[in-house]
């Protein structure tokens, strides 16, 4: 059974750069045999759901709820450089510790 790996990456203020990096990391880890959870894919589905339901665009808190939910289903959390300066990544770190996830750093 493949291990699930979540990518924790700073996003706010550098969305496009982070999207590209997350996609590269996803390919890298998938080539190593991991099932990878990319937060940008979570965001894409959340945005589509809000649109289909006629809701306002998702808030930062909505994104974090979904990301934390996905993180909890993973075995390993990969923290990218800069995570400690990111509000979202620090929330993900707290959850990783709380749920005793294996943590690796870039």
How does the language model describe each region?
Residues 1-106:
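Conserved catalytic or regulatory cores that recognize and/or transform ribose-phosphate-containing ligands
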